[in-house]
């Protein structure tokens, strides 16, 4: 079968090779020959011989039929071959196509897989894109909201800057304006757009521009902030003083872009300061004027009384003259304290060191001190440790002032016994004075306080402060330090005190200060309501009160006291604080609620803790506080405070007002000031003080909050000077305490002083206004 296929293939290939015609002719010829051969073979077999007709017939028959049959067959074969070839080609193409399809199928699968991956990636990317779009929308919304907020904040900041009365401006590195607020526009008369790119010389006067440029250069040169004051002109010609602060401006990477400036109008502050300085100068001028006017008659009284003491006198005349002499010297030295205090405030105390006859100095000191001691029945001893120099170089007046102050205090606080002054001179040119007394002594907790300005030691029972200005020891110690020495003190309560004065003296000396003048005027007989629940305290208080000529009714409870009290029936009510049913504070509040203030007598608290609770008692409506156990000196002083014994008909209200005024105001200075310059200058100064005080108090509080000790002291000094210039003694004393950080426990107490200043200054001003109005009517 295989060979047949090969033979057929050979047949077809030959036909295709020779062509249809030639192959047909060749095949026909071959068939004719074959037919002849077969015919001859058959004839030979059948007949045994071959005739020519047989051959011709075979040739003819073969030539007639074979070509057509061969041609037809060849055509068929050719067509079949062509069909086969076409089929072969088609098969080949199909194979190629199949292979290509297979390849494409593989590629398609790969592409499908890749496409699936791409689709997955695209779907993921699409999801991420959608998420990003969502986040972007949120971010866009947030940015829009932030932009709106920024615009609102920018608008608010701009409105805030424009609403500020302070100047705000910016200048770049070329010293050109980059922006400003509304206040700056008003100052320059130009809008912000007009100011941009202008330089100071284009905006200010030549003098002002020069200072502006100078300060700008300092800021740029040193890269530090700068604060200064400068007067600038408004377009209408009005001048204003500004406190200007300039700071370099940096971006977030630390690159400087220019400076920012702020300016606050302090014109009014300047005016107030100038007014206060003028008032202070007026006060100094006033003190200087009356210094001469008072010293002349005082010196005459002292000199003439001393001369008269050397003449023949009766015992009574000598006693009176000694009183006049000591009182005049005391008054003069108290005035010296006031003068020195004023000088120390202005830092103008100067020492006049001259040769001093020390022997005569001690003799004069002994004579004068002995006179003062005799007034109270005391012994005076001068114990010099020899040898002493005959002359020393010092300010004799100042040394005498210090010693007189120490001796006067020793006599003042000694009821019986003696006062001893010891003097010695050591190597190193130091003079030592010891002033020892046998008086009441000083509590240990007050030893460090007695040298503070205005501090006054309480009496022996811890009640009312002893009389005096409270400035003598403070002035004396400052003077001693100026003279190269100091004053120290040792004391034992109930046994006496010893003050030691040292000064540097190749030849040195100083004067005495401050004396004491007891007021022995008779006291009025009062009807007293004593509210006390402890029987022993009742006995002590009743005995003291009746000893002074008073009649006493006793209430043991608060309820009984309220029932017993009737307006006009009692001249004085003494209230114990701790009662069985209520406190003395409750009684005071109830009485002030029931009755008008003018119908109430003085309400005085009895307590064992005056210093801690006094302000609380005063706030509850009480008029004063006495310490228990009740003492004659304290009670006497309190009665003198509320009653003018020379005019028993004067109303209690007036007496209370006067006593309060004396505690709050510098009455002598105000009276003399009123007589010399009239009320207008006082009221003008007071008006200035009222304007300045809120600012002072605010600064004080802020400095206290910031614990700025220097700032507190500076503001305290300002307040002290301002209050003193208008006669507000209480505020002046508070200012003195606030400005004196060397006072004992200053840091613990300064907050309370500032709070007291804040709470009381308006009340003190009203008291002064009322006093001026009343004094003017007189």
Swiss-Prot record:
Domain called Histidine kinase: residue spans: 289-507
Bilayer topology: Multi-pass membrane protein
Gene Ontology CC annotations of this record: plasma membrane
EC number of this enzyme: 2.7.13.3
Transmembrane segments: 26-46, 58-78
Periplasmic topological domain: 47-57
Highest taxon above the source species: Bacteria
Residue intervals of the PAC domain: 226-278
Reaction(s) catalysed by this chain's protein: ATP + protein L-histidine = ADP + protein N-phospho-L-histidine
Cytoplasmic side: 1-25, 79-778
Modified residue annotations for Phosphohistidine: 292, 717
Annotated ranges, domain HPt: 678-771
GO biological process terms held by the UniProt record: regulation of DNA-templated transcription
Signal peptide: none
Positions of post-translational 4-aspartylphosphate modification: 576
Gene3D superfamilies to which the protein is assigned, alphabetical: 1.10.287.130, 3.40.50.2300, His Kinase A (phosphoacceptor) domain, Histidine kinase-like ATPase, C-terminal domain, HPT domain, PAS domain
GO molecular function: ATP binding; histidine phosphotransfer kinase activity; phosphorelay sensor kinase activity
Locations listed in the record: Cell inner membrane
Post-translational modification: Activation requires a sequential transfer of a phosphate group from a His in the primary transmitter domain, to an Asp in the receiver domain and to a His in the secondary transmitter domain.
InterPro entries: ArcB_TM_sf, CheY-like_superfamily, HATPase_C_sf, His_kinase_dom, HisK_dim/P_dom, HisK_dim/P_sf, HKR_ArcB_TM, HPT_dom_sf
Principal EC category: transferase
Every Response regulatory domain range: 527-643
Keywords: ATP-binding, Cell inner membrane, Cell membrane, Kinase, Membrane, Nucleotide-binding, Phosphoprotein, Transcription, Transcription regulation, Transferase, Transmembrane, Transmembrane helix, Two-component regulatory system
Protein purpose: Member of the two-component regulatory system ArcB/ArcA. Sensor-regulator protein for anaerobic repression of the arc modulon. Activates ArcA via a four-step phosphorelay. ArcB can also dephosphorylate ArcA by a reverse phosphorelay involving His-717 and Asp-576.
Protein name: Aerobic respiration control sensor protein ArcB
Organism: Escherichia coli O157:H7
């Amino acid at each position: 079968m295989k060979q047949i296929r090969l033979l057929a293939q050979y047949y077809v290939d030959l036909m295709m090779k020779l062509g249809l015609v030639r192959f047909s002719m060749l095949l026909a010829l071959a068939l004719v020959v074959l037919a002849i051969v077969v015919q001859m073979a058959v004839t030979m077999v059948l007949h045994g011989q071959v005739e020519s007709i047989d051959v011709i017939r075979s040739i003819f028959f073969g030539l007639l039929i074979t070509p057509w049959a061969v041609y037809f067959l060849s055509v068929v074969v050719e067509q079949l071959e062509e069909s086969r070839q076409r089929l072969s080609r088609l098969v080949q193409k199909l194979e190629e196509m199949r292979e290509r399809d297979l390849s494409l199928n593989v590629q398609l699968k790969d592409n499908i897989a890749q496409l699936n991956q791409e689709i997955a990636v695209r779907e993921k990317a699409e999801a991420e894109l959608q998420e990003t779009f969502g986040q972007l929308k949120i971010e866009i919304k947030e940015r829009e909201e932030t932009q709106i907020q920024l615009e609102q904040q920018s608008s608010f900041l701009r409105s805030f800057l424009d609403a500020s009365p302070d100047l705000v401006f910016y200048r770049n590195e070329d010293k050109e304006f980059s922006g400003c607020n509304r206040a700056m526009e008003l100052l320059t008369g130009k809008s912000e757009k007009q100011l941009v790119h202008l330089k100071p010389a284009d905006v200010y006067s030549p003098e002002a521009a020069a200072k502006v440029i100078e300060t700008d250069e300092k800021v740029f040169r040193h890269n530090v902030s700068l604060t200064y004051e400068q007067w600038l002109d408004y377009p209408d010609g009005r001048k204003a003083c500004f406190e200007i602060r300039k700071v370099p401006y940096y971006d977030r990477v630390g690159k400087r872009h220019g400076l920012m400036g702020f300016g606050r109008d302090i014109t009014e502050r300047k005016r107030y300061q100038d007014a206060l300085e003028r008032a202070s100068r007026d006060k100094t001028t006033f003190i200087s004027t009356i210094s001469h006017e008072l010293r002349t008659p005082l010196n005459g009284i002292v000199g003439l009384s001393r001369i008269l003491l050397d003449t023949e006198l009766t015992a009574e005349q000598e006693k009176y003259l000694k009183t006049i002499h000591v009182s005049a010297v005391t008054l003069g030295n108290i005035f010296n304290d006031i003068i020195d205090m004023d000088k120390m405030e202005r830092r103008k105390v100067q020492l006049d060191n001259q040769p001093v006859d020390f022997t005569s100095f001690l003799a004069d000191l002994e004579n004068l001190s002995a006179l003062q001691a005799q007034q109270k029945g005391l012994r005076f001893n001068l114990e010099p440790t020899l040898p002493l120099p005959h002359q020393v170089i010092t300010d004799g007046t100042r040394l005498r002032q210090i010693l007189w102050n120490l001796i006067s205090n020793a006599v003042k606080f000694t009821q019986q016994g003696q006062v001893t002054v010891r003097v010695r001179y050591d190597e190193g040119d130091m003079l030592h004075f010891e002033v020892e007394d046998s008086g009441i002594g000083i509590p240990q907790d007050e030893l460090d306080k007695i040298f503070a300005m205005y501090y006054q030691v309480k009496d022996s029972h811890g009640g009312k402060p002893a009389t005096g200005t409270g400035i003598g020891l403070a002035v004396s110690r400052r003077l001693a330090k100026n003279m190269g020495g100091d004053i120290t003190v040792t004391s034992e309560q109930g046994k006496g005190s010893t003050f030691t004065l040292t000064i540097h003296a190749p030849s040195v000396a100083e004067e005495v200060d401050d004396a004491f003048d007891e007021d022995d005027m008779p006291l009025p007989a009062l009807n007293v309501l004593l509210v006390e629940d402890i029987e022993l305290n009742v006995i002590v208080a009743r005995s003291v009160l009746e000893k002074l000529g008073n009649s006493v009714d006793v209430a043991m409870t608060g309820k009984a006291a309220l029932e017993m009290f009737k307006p006009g029936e009692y001249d004085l009510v003494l209230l114990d604080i701790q009662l069985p049913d209520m406190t003395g504070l409750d009684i005071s509040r109830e009485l002030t609620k029931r009755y008008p203030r003018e119908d109430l007598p003085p309400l005085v608290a009895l307590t064992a803790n005056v210093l801690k609770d006094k302000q609380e008692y005063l706030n509850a409506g009480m008029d004063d506080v006495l310490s228990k156990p009740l003492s004659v000196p304290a009670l006497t002083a309190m009665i003198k405070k509320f009653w003018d014994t020379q005019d028993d008909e004067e109303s209690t209200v007036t007496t209370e007002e006067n006593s309060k005024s004396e505690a709050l105001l510098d009455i002598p200075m105000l009276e003399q000031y009123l007589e010399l310059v009239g009320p207008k200058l006082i009221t003008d100064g007071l008006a200035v003080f009222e304007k300045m005080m809120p600012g002072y108090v605010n600064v004080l509080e802020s400095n206290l909050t910031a614990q700025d000790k220097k700032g507190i002291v500076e503001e305290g000094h300002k307040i002290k000077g301002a209050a003193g210039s208008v006669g507000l003694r209480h505020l002046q004393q508070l200012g003195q305490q606030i400005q004196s950080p060397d006072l004992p426990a200053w840091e613990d107490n300064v907050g309370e002083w500032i709070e007291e200043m804040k709470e009381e200054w308006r009340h003190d001003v009203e008291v002064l206004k009322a006093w001026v109005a009343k004094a003017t009517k007189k």
